[in-house]
């Protein structure tokens, strides 16, 4: 399920007047056009600039990122956590400014900037007729990950329609431009996805997204911290018999680098908690060494039902030392 960047402007105006929707669509199109016409290094510089502003003025985003890094890396010095938190916000903003060349630019130009590691983890199961489920966390450019997967086989991905219909059409066109197909996040859509994977197709799932429904996950360790982990990917793997693969697309100085790795065997366990723990471990392995490109602004360490510790209860305090370990 490839989602729009979590701080996306369109999400904030889903119930606003039509004129505002037109304004948002126009701004998005202008941004896409500008970033499509300029070199990738310039669009990234623009994203970093936006990220610096967000980090400076969006206290909640900054505090969540620092808090998550405190939980994941308690041994890091406060200065290092703050630096990585700032880089993380900039990385998320870069994703927004990279959308233009990805959704409306030349795919041949984009693919020429993409190097790939471990592609056999995807192509070998497909060649044998087995479907593939790629688990791609909020790391690097997950939009490009979905687009690249669509060039490797028949991609069907879950998609939650946006209330802004014009923006929804824009997103659809962009995400399907390399041949992928989007289905709604409904029982019928999930059934269609499972059928496609059983026939030897591909899908992509964000394994580190916290579901709202208490019945849609289990609390499993992530960087040693118990947090709510979705069972969607696990259930799809069990229902479809697909091969599970970890995947990400990271930024490099000259473009992008895709990484595909077969998951550990624990992902296929009949014990759902063991499987979710293995999935989280796979996400950790992708993040380590690439922490600055992970979306730490997301409240990943939530528990459901609410556990004995709320890792984010202190965020509302007006007085806070953001360089202090606050656990």
Regions picked out by a protein language model, each given a short descriptive name:
Residues 3-136, 168-173, 177-179, 322-327:
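Membrane-anchoring hydrophobic helices of lipid-metabolizing enzymes
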Residues 6-15, 19, 54, 82-89, ...:
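Non-catalytic C-terminal accessory region of glycerolipid acyltransferases
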Residues 112-116, 164, 183-187, 226-227, ...:
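A conditional alpha-helix N-cap/helix-loop micro-motif detector
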Residues 119-123, 146-147, 168-172, 193-194, ...:
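Short amphipathic alpha-helical segments and helix-helix/interface helices
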